[in-house]
């Protein structure tokens, strides 16, 4: 992969970021002022403050980053607010359901579901997160195939999404399937981290790629005949991998929490983020996944706040409490089991999607695929949207070595502490006025949205161009007469031929 050394900043500028957060619409501006206190608005102004300290500008690390591979107009709050009018989602339902698939407490060597549930309840403050009883993949009408880079099987996402849609609880705001099995959305893709079905608020995500080198199988190589039958698509022939366990390091657990919250945000209606470093960025390589932060940028945070109505300070305090618990748990485990992890999460050999056709070589897993690219029919509903399938074709096999994940969690806790201190700061209104005045004094940057400006019909001309206009007018009149006479001559000749034939 071609790397940018050092990484290059990608920014829309303070004025564009402010418009994305607050909007240029008067009603949405008034909504923003009434929804947030001065201290909250000062905190959110970090989105467009040139001297921001809490949120980071996007960085381009390679020529194949998701941001460059899928250039699209980013979703600002005004666009998000307008899209809600088209959704039938009822926010009176306050339950998020997690549907484990071949996954139960203790299977992964730690209370994985408990960690995910507590993280999601802090992240989506005001919603209750429930775990449904685990279902066997063999009981789902789901196609499968042998994995290209492991000894296990990969499950096709469409069958799982159909199952979740047909078995969605009546009080569910959304349902997210969780599996330790690898997933694939199309035959041409090597794998995907997740996929959701727009309009039905159901999705599925896989944690298989976050186990690193800790995949252990009691029976690692199933019978070849069963593999061939399973690859043919028969759910009855899907072999059960007995004794299969996944052991997660602290790094892997954090990635599981990030992917879960990422998918749930999409199920609630938030689009991918292209403004600042944010959990809702897409990813085309594993290092992009690992670089994503565990929280939202201010623009996406306003979208989530609009849906759930929490207080920002309370949410960050809940996340801080969850982080402290996680640090205590993993600090004890690392002290007792130093050999469990060297905090190295290896890339797969293909680093994601394998392209075996002549279509677009790199496609975003976090956006709807184009009809002529990776389109794939889905019965009785809209096309599912893939999330974070790794799609860089130029990636080679590399190993990403990070610092201690517990240290990273402690840094995240320190960042949350800084957010809490900003939200508790007094005299925020005066400081906010200074920031707004400095940003409003900057020149506005017009964003290209993919539509060319409307051609002006009347171009004002000066009086000194009267002669030129007369000459051009005479010329066009002459051409018009010639064309008219030519059409009349052709019409006459064709009429004569038609009469002669009769």
UniProtKB/Swiss-Prot annotation:
InterPro entries: Archaemetzincin, MetalloPept_cat_dom_sf, Pept_M54_archaemetzincn
Residue ranges, annotated region (Disordered): 336-383
Residues annotated to bind Zn(2+) 1: 262, 266
Coiled coil: none
Gene3D superfamilies assigned to the protein according to its UniProt record, in alphabetical order: Collagenase (Catalytic Domain)
Domain of life: Eukaryota
CDD domains to which the protein is assigned, alphabetical: Peptidase_M54 (cd11375)
GO biological process: proteolysis
Details of cofactor binding: Binds 2 Zn(2+) ions per subunit. One is catalytic, whereas the other seems to have a structural role.
Known cofactor(s): Zn(2+)
Active site, renumbered: 263
GO molecular-function terms, A-Z: metal ion binding; metallopeptidase activity
Catalytic activity, EC: 3.4.-.-
Keyword annotations of the record: Hydrolase, Metal-binding, Metalloprotease, Protease, Zinc
PROSITE patterns: ZINC_PROTEASE (PS00142)
Transmembrane segments: none
Residues reported in the UniProt entry to bind Zn(2+) 2: 273, 278, 297, 300
Function of the protein: Probable zinc metalloprotease.
Protein family membership: Belongs to the peptidase M54 family.
Name recorded for this polypeptide: Archaemetzincin-1
Taxonomy of the source species: Eukaryota, Metazoa, Chordata, Craniata, Vertebrata
